[in-house]
């Protein structure tokens, strides 16, 4: 997708070198927007393979209001493992090798990488096989799914923002309050990772549903391709439920950054030529957005270039 490649080029050429929480360092810019016409195809990277089924299972995990990585692991989805693992290795229950700064150390020390990978495999196995352990150490706090589906009020009640949003689109499509927020200041200290994609808004015009995402922190190489595909998929699912066509996905970013250890991968991606976008295929079986399963969602005509691996910063 040209819009995404333009973002990578812009940050490489105009970004500012900054330190960051992870210790990796970034090239960063503040304030950037991309627009995708969802009528022109499903916006997923074609200059590198994005594992679409992982996008699907993560979004369904959000839609279920789930915040435990066990569901993800049951669907062979490892994208949230490091944050749960970090909580575990910092606890008194962890008795293995020192895992301080495991992400950076695994990248730089092959011997430690083997130890880390072995500990991670043991952790994943325990999450899958031991429900008590999973309940304690698979939890990531009140992240996206919890805020979307069960926002706690000061009166002790809960708000299902997503269900309310869908109902409002049906009954008052011209509303300017078609918003879901994952940014709950009270819960931030207890989240494994505060919401990067923190707020989204829908807009109805000419029989089409459009979505704008505000993302406070955008990991351009690893995170943003998932975010684009995830919110495009969410727009399609909601449009199906409310009887509208899809319009645009508008992606607005605050701190948009390239990690310093992703620069060579970015240059490799920029050397590739985009291909035709695939088509999203949804099963007719699910009655509502909350009834979808991974097998109900697929892409037709997705023929990307090979994946480009890069380390994740935790």
UniProtKB/Swiss-Prot annotation:
Active site: 196 (nucleophile)
Entry's localization field: Cytoplasm
Pathway: Pyrimidine metabolism; dTTP biosynthesis
EC number, as in UniProt: 2.1.1.45
Alphabetized PROSITE patterns for the sequence: THYMIDYLATE_SYNTHASE (PS00091)
Residues involved in (6R)-5,10-methylene-5,6,7,8-tetrahydrofolate binding: 219, 313
Molecular functions (GO terms): thymidylate synthase activity
Reactions this protein catalyses: dUMP + (6R)-5,10-methylene-5,6,7,8-tetrahydrofolate = 7,8-dihydrofolate + dTMP
InterPro entries: Thymidate_synth/dCMP_Mease, Thymidate_synth/dCMP_Mease_dom, Thymidate_synth/dCMP_Mease_sf, Thymidylate_synthase, Thymidylate_synthase_AS
Main subcellular localisation: cytoplasm
Keywords annotated in UniProt: Cytoplasm, Methyltransferase, Nucleotide biosynthesis, Transferase
One GO CC annotation: cytosol
The keyword Transferase is annotated on this UniProt entry: yes
Protein purpose: Catalyzes the reductive methylation of 2'-deoxyuridine-5'-monophosphate (dUMP) to 2'-deoxythymidine-5'-monophosphate (dTMP) while utilizing 5,10-methylenetetrahydrofolate (mTHF) as the methyl donor and reductant in the reaction, yielding dihydrofolate (DHF) as a by-product. This enzymatic reaction provides an intracellular de novo source of dTMP, an essential precursor for DNA biosynthesis.
PANTHER family: THYMIDYLATE SYNTHASE (PTHR11548:SF9), THYMIDYLATE SYNTHASE 1 (PTHR11548)
Family according to the record: Belongs to the thymidylate synthase family. Bacterial-type ThyA subfamily.
Subunit structure: Homodimer.
Protein name per UniProt: Thymidylate synthase
